[in-house]
Amino acid sequence: MAKKKIEAIIKLQVAAGKANPSPPIGPALGQHGVNIMGFCKEFNAKTQGMEPGMPIPVEISVYSDRSFTFEMKTPPASYLIKKAIKVKSGSSNPSKDFIGTITREQLEEIAKVKDPDLTAADIDAAVRIIAGSARSMGVKVEGVE
């Protein structure tokens, strides 16, 4: 059997357990002829055990015969940081206005969750990557240079 040819790769961010055919999912998949309800049911089934509403980046590979496969990534670092310090949004002026403080332990937890998607050599490098994301959101970082 010949290997199927990938026709398109679609990258979306979908809330866990809340995939439905409305925008942005419907139009993005529809223009490539993908079975939208098939994707929604499959995605919702795979994200059933996750926190409802958590944004999940997903990469959908569409093949020439209109079939598809998808790969779920880890939630965005900004979402995990906001969840850890219990705030709704980042600072509008991150260099001057701080919205909270995050500890090294919290950063290590986030780094362990994000590890499969990060290119860091070790957990310390991953912590520094997450710390940089936190600083750019206006979060004070404790325990990391």
Swiss-Prot record:
Keywords: Methylation, Ribonucleoprotein, Ribosomal protein, RNA-binding, rRNA-binding. Gene3D superfamilies: Ribosomal protein L11, C-terminal domain, Ribosomal protein L11/L12, N-terminal domain. Belongs to the universal ribosomal protein uL11 family. GO terms for molecular function: large ribosomal subunit rRNA binding; structural constituent of ribosome. It comes from the Bacteria. The keyword Lyase does not apply. InterPro entries: Ribosomal_uL11 (IPR000911), Ribosomal_uL11_bac-typ (IPR006519), Ribosomal_uL11_C (IPR020783), Ribosomal_uL11_C_sf (IPR036769), Ribosomal_uL11_CS (IPR020785), Ribosomal_uL11_N (IPR020784), Ribosomal_uL11_N_sf (IPR036796). One or more lysine residues are methylated. Part of the ribosomal stalk of the 50S ribosomal subunit. Interacts with L10 and the large rRNA to form the base of the stalk. L10 forms an elongated spine to which L12 dimers bind in a sequential fashion forming a multimeric L10(L12)X complex. NCBIfam families: L11_bact (TIGR01632). This is Large ribosomal subunit protein uL11. One of its GO terms (biological process) is translation. It comes from Francisella philomiragia subsp. philomiragia (strain ATCC 25017 / CCUG 19701 / FSC 153 / O#319-036). Forms part of the ribosomal stalk which helps the ribosome interact with GTP-bound translation factors. GO terms for cellular component: cytosolic large ribosomal subunit.
